[in-house]
Amino acid sequence: ASLYTLQGVDFECVPLKIITDDAEYLDNGTMDALGMAQTLRTYKGKTSTSCPNVSDWLAAYEGADEVYAITITGTLSGSYNAAQLAAEEYQQENPGKRVFVLDSLSTGPEQRLLAEHLRDLLAEGREFDEVCEEMLRYHKHTHLLFSLESLANLARNGRVKPAVAAMARMLGIRVIGQASEAGELDVLCKTRGEH
């Protein structure tokens, strides 16, 4: 559910990087996601991610009078902190310009819901403060549920033990989870099978 463009609004994607010993993938809409996924399935080394830095966020904010940024959960990435630092710097260097940064406390699909709601508010011509207030209200009513087919990537980046990932693969176990109110990705249950 990556979001690279959003019709009807001036939109900028500030991407994460996916890093292996052999390659660096920039999740910006031009990346060959299927090719990367195939490579990672057979890759034996560690993988990691890198969040956008303050300069990346400042480049995205450049020239705008009002900026609304929605980040991946701050519990998984430093994106929110970098976006906040960039917001402070941008507003200091550009008096009168305003930046609102929202930690989605989530990933993917919920971020899309937030971005689409933001677009709709802007299309209605709402004022900056009203948009910020409504986004905080709306955010309380969105949630993320997810299903993981494989734990391989979590094992490669040290979040689960490789033996656990291998056992889950052999037994056909899928993890069903949700994003908590604090932005943690929590396991709800484990199930077996394809669907």
Show the residue positions of the predicted features.
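Short catalytic-loop micro-motif centered on adjacent basic/acidic residues
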Residues: 48, 69, 101
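Short coil/turn segments at secondary-structure boundaries
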Residues: 51-55, 149-150
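N-terminal glycine-rich phosphate/adenylate-binding segment common to multiple enzyme folds
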Residues: 53-84, 88-90
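N-terminal glycine-rich anion-binding loop in soluble enzyme alpha/beta folds
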Residues: 1-52
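Structured helix-beta-strand junction loops
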Residues: 42-43, 63-64, 70, 138-141
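Mixed-charge interfacial surface used for oligomerization/domain docking
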Residues: 2-12, 16-18, 22-23, 75-79, ...
